[in-house]
Amino acid sequence: MSIRLSRRAALFSSAVAASSAALPGLALAQVRADTRTDEEIAAAADAWVQRCMAAWPEQPAVSLALVRDGKTVLAKGYGVRRQGKAEPADEHTLFAIASNSKNVTAACLAILVDEGKVKWDEPIRTYLPGFTLSDPMVGERITVRDTLSHRAGFGLGAGDLLFWPNSDRTRAEVLAQAAFVPIEDGFREDYHYCNLMFVVAGAVIEKMSGLSWEDFVQTRIFDKVGMSESVPLARLADPKKSALPHGRVGPPLRYQGAMTQIADSIVEVWNWDSAAAAGGICTSAHDWAKWIAVRLNDGRLADGTRLFSEAAAREMVKPNIIVSSSNGPTAELPNRAVASTYAMGLQVQDYRGERLATHGGGSPGGISATVLIPGRKIGFSVFTNAEESFLLRALRSGLSDIAMNQVDVDWIADSKKREAEGTEKSLKAAVEIDAKQAAGAAPSMPLDAYVGTWRDPWYGDIVIEQKTEGRGRNRKTGLWLRFTHTPALQGWLEPYDGETFRTRFPDKREEDAFITFNIATAKPATATVKGVSPDIDFSYDYQDLRLTRV
């Protein structure tokens, strides 16, 4: 049995990264001349991917794009599109790249800045009159730059339940509900990853261009760059050309157990139409290599024309908020940055004394990474169709070292060690969770006291009802919970310990939750929610729900 952490790990592990912006207070080494040929670098990268695939034999597919000096030196697929099928992945296979889409959204705004239609530091209200947030001051002052920099003051993943898992809410409804999502921290004080503000950025693109986000991406990015295989929305991705999602769905918890295919198409588990600007794109190694070349060339296209200006390119990699800081690498953390920051749609940091910029991406059944090293005019991407975050760590770190010609860490051994430690910790937690339920106190009230409609200001309604299912010995009666805007989040609500209950969603791709009811009078009046698993994906932001009986 094994565990692979959620996309939290893909986005927030000690990432190697890239940027042409200076990092404040950090002296960076001069890049040493690299006399290796493109073929030598490509061969080393190819061999490394094959080693990693051998070390993680359950991984179905990996896709690699490697670019140097504006030229694709390697675009290749490894493995199969779906587990157990003779359907090879190649450089044209589509993968969901999730949050790697964010730097495309930033580039869309860069184009509008160049055209004089948008300013980076202009308040959102200039473009979206009436826009507001739960903190009126933040709603008044927040700018385009803020929406792209994870510094608005929201908690990690705040508001993601508006569109994750697949929701029935429209883009306009998500934008309207953003006004009620709680803001926990100071404005522009701390970094907290926030998909919701990229939805706002996407709305600015739509309002100021007159095009939908997806049409703008298609006509102003994909068509200009020559990315003919890419699609801006997962529902447009042909399943026959896609790497299908895989993951571990237990038992005992999500991200544990055996590897399995979890969907027959990407859109089945990743329909982010309402939040596409935060992570909607599906692309191939063949196409994304072209995008990497544009970013490394500061917006210049292969024909010499510009997609966006050099000034805009510099602005997009200018650090806006500190993610973390440290004393640098150690034997235990060999790739730890001295300073890690977030710019606009890209994370910017140091690595091995050089300036770097990166982003991760994670969707159900797939994680990915893009790494740019502009001082060397080299960059790469790694796409996968499973949630093996330690595999991605080994791939990303090892390929970065190959690109920088400094191979001195065994990233497979390092990642395997961390994987084993994480597995042991998570399985222990799962045993403790089940043991506590077995020994838990009974609820203080009969089950019908908890029945009703429970409302959160930003999510909406959660309905609890009594339900009977099956016949004879298979007959089951109990509480059934239903998130009204999220079809997959419905299932049995079982007593756990006292006034705390836990869900048992039949769809094992989803994360279960604890609900604790607060007894005010004769019936529960309010309730709070949190995830069951210690490895829960941050986008299940149950903890932000504040339920009141309607």
Annotate each predicted stretch with a short phrase.
Residues 27-29, 33:
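Boundary at the C-terminal end of the N-terminal hydrophobic targeting segment
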Residues 33, 323-324, 332, 397-550:
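Peripheral terminal and inter-domain segments
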Residues 82, 136-364, 369:
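Short, surface-exposed loop or secondary-structure junction motifs
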